């Protein structure tokens, strides 16, 4: 039904599933996704939050909450949720460009560059601090760090 864009039908079916099992994270996430598709982002967040109470490491809920927050203009919060998802599953290729675009919207080009490279938020400050200390650009510092890491392996 999602593929057919019948989101109202998905909502009805998921409500039935949730009545049977209120901890069905698949149904909760599907509710949120369908609500997102219907531009009901605040409602969607409630379902992602419920999922995250049940499983704080549910990457689907983290990513979709980030999407909802982004649609609502809460870019920094969205970035933080993408970052949590990235810490749990660093193989997700859609996270770095999504974080980068949000940093661009916040007019933070250095962070946008680092996010696009897959750098976690917690590691950005060190790179920025090292660049300042070494009197070089963020780009140069990142490349220098990558070169050093490659040679140490």
Residue positions per predicted region:
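Terminal, low-structured helical/coil segments at or just beyond the last alpha-helical repeat
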Residues: 105-153
């Amino acid at each position: 039904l999602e593929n057919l864009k019948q989101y109202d039908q998905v909502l009805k079916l998921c409500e039935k599933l949730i009545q049977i099992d209120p901890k069905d994270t698949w149904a909760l996430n599907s509710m949120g996704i369908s609500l997102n598709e219907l531009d009901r982002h605040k409602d969607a967040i409630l379902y992602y939050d419920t999922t995250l109470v049940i499983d704080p490491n549910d990457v689907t809920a983290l990513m979709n909450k980030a999407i909802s927050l982004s649609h609502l203009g809460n870019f920094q919060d969205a970035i933080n949720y993408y970052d949590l998802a990235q810490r749990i599953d660093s193989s997700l290729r859609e996270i770095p460009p999504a974080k980068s675009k949000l940093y661009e919207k916040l007019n933070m080009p250095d962070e946008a560059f680092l996010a696009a490279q897959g750098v976690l938020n917690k590691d950005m400050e060190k790179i920025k601090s090292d660049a300042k200390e070494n009197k070089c650009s963020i780009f140069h510092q990142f490349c220098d760090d990558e070169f050093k890491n490659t040679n140490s392996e």
